[in-house]
Amino acid sequence: MECGQSFVIAKMNTRNVDFVSIFYPQRKSNLRGDTMKKLSFLSALCGAAMGFGAVASANAATTLEAVKAKGFVQCGVSQGLPGFSNADDSGKWTGLDVDLCRAVAAAVFGDAEKVKYSPLSAKQRFTALSSGEIDILSRNTTWTMTRDTQLGLNFAGVNYYDGQGMMVPTALGVKSATELDGANICTNTGTTTELNITDYFRTNGMSFNLVAFEKADEVVAAYDAGRCDVYTTDRSGLAAQRGKLTQPDSHVVLPEIISKEPLGPVVRQGDDQWFNIVRWSLNAMINAEELGISSSNVNMKKFQSNLAPSVARLIGKEGKFGEELGLSNDWAYNIIMQVGNYGESYEKHVGLNTPLKLARGVNSLWSKGGILYAAPIR
C-alpha cells in the first residue's frame, strides 16, 4: 500500500470526520482537535518517509558509477559453451558473448581486459543479474516477452540469431524430428528449450520423456552415456557441445528448426544510462563491420583527414556521442581497436574456420542478405 493511500484510508476510518470542512474549508469545521492532530501526524509521517525514499534514491550509485568505483565490469556468462563463453585451462575466457563484455569494458575504461566473469547456470542467471551480483548478463540468453516484461530486466539487443534444434546418434537411424515419438530428450532446466520442445511434440501429436539437468555439462554427459535419444538446445549450442562428445562424428543435427531464439545481452531495468552503454557497444561493433572499420585499420582511420561522416562519428572524430553516454568520445574506437567489429568476433569464435563451423546465415549484415542491423550513430 502506498503512503498516500494509507493517509486517505486513515481519514476515512477516523470517527467524526467533518467532510464539509474537508471539501469546503471556508466553512466552519466541527472536527475535533485530537482527530485533526492524528491526521496531521500521519501526513507528517508520510512526508518524512517519502522524503527519506527520495534521498536514498538520489544517493544510489548508478551502474556506471559502481563499475568505475570497483574498476571492472562483472559479466555473467555460461558455465562453458565453446565459441560463446568458455574458459581455457589457464582460466582465460573467450567467445562471442565474452567479446561483448570486453566491448563494454573497452567503452567504459578504454581497456577491454577490465572484466571479471561469473559462470552461471540457466537457472542462476536472472537472479544473479537482479541481485546486482553481475553488471551484465551475456550468456546465450533468449529475448522473450515474459523475460523482458516480468523480471525487471531489459534486453539490450541481439548478438546472435538462433533457433532450437535436435541432435541424435547416427545409429538411431532418424532423419527427421517427426520420427521421435516416445523419445527420451535431454536438455537444461530454466530455459526456453523445455517449453519449445513441449510445444513441438504436442503440435505434432507425439509423446516424449524430458530428462533435464541444471548444468550444461551434465546434459552432455547424460546424452553421451546413452541416457537420452535426443539432445536439444539452440543449434549453435549443439555445434558447440558436439565437440565434447566421445565420438562427435557419430551424431547428427536434424534439419528441423523448431523456434526463434534471439540471443543477446541483458541488464537490470531502471538504469537507462547503463542500458544505453551496453546497447551502443553492440551497435558500434555492428556498425563498424558495415562501414568496413576493423581492428586492423581503425588506427589508420583515426589519423585520416578525409573520412566519411559516418566513420568520423563512429570513431569519435566528429560529434560528442561518447559524452552522451557518460563516456569518452573515443569509446567506439577503443571497442574496435581492442575487440574488433562484429564480423571479426564472429569469424574468430564461431565461424567456418573454427570447430563450430557456423556459417553467418541470418547473422550476416542486412546489406549481405542477413538480418543484422544496427541503429546509426548520428
Language model feature labels by segment:
Residues V115-T127, L210-A225:
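Short helix-initiation/N-cap motifs at beta->coil->alpha
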Residues Q74-G83, W93-V108, T142, D162-E214, ...:
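Bilobed "Venus flytrap"/periplasmic-binding protein-like clamshell domains
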Residues R102, A106, G110, K114-E179, ...:
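Acidic, polar ligand-binding/catalytic clefts
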Residues D99-R102, A106-V108, A171-V174, T178, ...:
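Extended ligand-binding regions for polar small-molecule ligands
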Residues S43-G53:
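Bacterial N-terminal signal peptides
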Residues A60-S138, F321, L327, Y342, ...:
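Extracytoplasmic small-molecule ligand-binding "clamshell" domains
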Residues I9-T35:
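Short, Lys/Arg-enriched N-terminal segments with co-localized hydrophobic residues
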Residues D34-T35, A54-A60:
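Sec/Tat signal peptide C-region and signal peptidase I cleavage site
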